[in-house]
C-alpha cells in the first residue's frame, strides 16, 4: 500500500473536510468519492473497520448524488463527516 493508497485516502479526507467546513458540495465530488472508494475497496488487505468507514462514506455519496439539496444533505451529515475523517486518520 504505497503512495497510491495514501493519496486516495488523502483525497477522500480532503473532500469530506471541504464538505464539513463549507457545508456545500457538488455531484462531481460525490462521484469522485465513489470512484476512490471503489478503488480502495478492491484492496483485499484493508482493515475491516476501515472498510466499514468506506462503506458508510460510499452510502453518503450515493444518497448525496440523488439528494434534492446537496447543501442540506451535507448539513445533515456534519457529525458523520468529522467522525469519518477522524477514523480515516487512525487507519492511514
From Swiss-Prot:
InterPro entries: YtzH
A Pfam family assignment: YtzH
Superkingdom to which the source organism belongs: Bacteria
Full protein name: Uncharacterized protein YtzH
Lineage: Bacteria, Bacillati, Bacillota, Bacilli, Bacillales
Amino acid at each position: 500500500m504505497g503512495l497510491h493508497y495514501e493519496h486516495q485516502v488523502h483525497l477522500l479526507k480532503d473532500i469530506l473536510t471541504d464538505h464539513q467546513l463549507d457545508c456545500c458540495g457538488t455531484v462531481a465530488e460525490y462521484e469522485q468519492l465513489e470512484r476512490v472508494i471503489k478503488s480502495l475497496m478492491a484492496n483485499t488487505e484493508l482493515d475491516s473497520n476501515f472498510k466499514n468507514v468506506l462503506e458508510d462514506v460510499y452510502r453518503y455519496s450515493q444518497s448525496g448524488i440523488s439528494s434534492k439539496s446537496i447543501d442540506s444533505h451535507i448539513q445533515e451529515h456534519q457529525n458523520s463527516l468529522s467522525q469519518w475523517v477522524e477514523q480515516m486518520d487512525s487507519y492511514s
